[in-house]
A protein has these predicted regions:
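Active-site or pore-adjacent capping/gating segments
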Residues: 88, 99-175
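Charged/polar positions within long, soluble alpha-helices
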Residues: 7-11, 51, 93, 129, ...
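Helix-rich catalytic cores of soluble enzyme domains
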Residues: 1-92, 105-122
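Metal- or metallocofactor-binding catalytic centers and their adjacent structured scaffolds
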Residues: 96
Length: 175
């Protein structure tokens, strides 16, 4: 969808550097390992396309994104364990250097979250950042073989999907 917006704005006569720095993206997270690199892949693809295809400046090449932990991964049975699932997804997002994060409440699988469950969801982020100290450290996963390999594999799969979409006329044509 991001490139669809880019093409639309360009067709209206705007220059890439006038709008691209203001774009931001929203991704859902999950528990599968591929979610550990979603931001890396998106940033790599975005930067390359903005630089090479659209001739955008450095600022336009910087992708900003928000992550929301996945409601799909929350279980209706034994909902008390959903905090663990959400914590793992939050760690993926933070290790992947997301710009902002929403952690789902453990009871969202069965109801509108209570005030107490929302407080617990917020506490997940606070504990990760303050007590674990991730906000003060560089990403320890950067350069790890599995992360680099996963990034390459996921990027390849995403680019193949982009090609399939383009063959069908882009996002709008595929709809």
């Amino acid at each position: 969808n991001g490139f669809t917006f880019v093409e639309y704005y360009l067709s209206r006569g705007m220059h890439i550097d006038d709008f691209a720095p203001n774009l931001s993206f929203f991704f859902s997270n999950g528990i599968d390992p591929e979610y550990a690199v979603i931001g890396r892949v998106a940033r790599r693809i975005w930067a390359k396309a903005i630089k090479e295809k659209y001739k955008g400046n450095d600022r336009s090449q910087k992708l900003k994104y928000h992550i929301q932990t996945s409601g799909r991964s929350l279980h209706a049975q034994e909902i008390d364990f959903n905090d663990i699932r959400t914590t793992l997804q939050a760690l993926y997002a933070i290790y992947d250097n997301c710009n902002s994060l929403h952690t789902n409440a453990y009871d969202e699988a069965i109801t509108t979250p209570t005030e107490a469950s929302v407080r617990r969801a917020m506490a997940i982020q606070l504990i990760i950042n303050k007590e674990l100290g991730l906000a003060k450290n560089e990403n320890p996963l950067q350069g790890a073989f599995i992360i680099e390999e996963l990034t390459d594999l996921v990027e390849e799969a995403v680019l193949q999907e982009f090609n399939r979409l383009n063959e069908r006329g882009g996002v709008l044509g595929a709809m």
